């Protein structure tokens, strides 16, 4: 789930650049800590949820969360929207991660961290390149989802699509980081940017995990 960030959205009181990026880091850390707690405590519960009900609730929650984050003028409502992304993704991770061994999870975790750091550094060096990627990345992601749905329907192995997804989400991290630098610095926009980066990083982590586990 990705979105194009409106960098002209001037909502709320402007904060300093340092405070803005500290807020982004704080919200990202909050989301990942909540996810880790859910994985550690809700694994058995998550695996016994009816899959149809879970998927419906997952997509509804993520959709409402995205709408709240993007459309509201209230930072508190944006934070509620952020939680509507973090919590269902936490349940998804709690259900999925027990199927992988700890070695693969650790590899995916550290690799994701290194890629994230690398993309932030590169996007700081070449921001103009990443500013031009928005439409291309969005279209590429939509095409990837379409191809994967078709492959799933016909039972085609999708291993190579994980590599394409890794490239897309890695570039999205750089793109969203540049958007954060260009955006109006406010509490509401820090939640918006944290949500975008959170989705990029989680998706990248899961794709790397799939690649690593399939190689074992």
Language-model segments: residues:
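A hydrophobic alpha-helical transmembrane-helix feature that marks the membrane cores
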Residues: 1-216
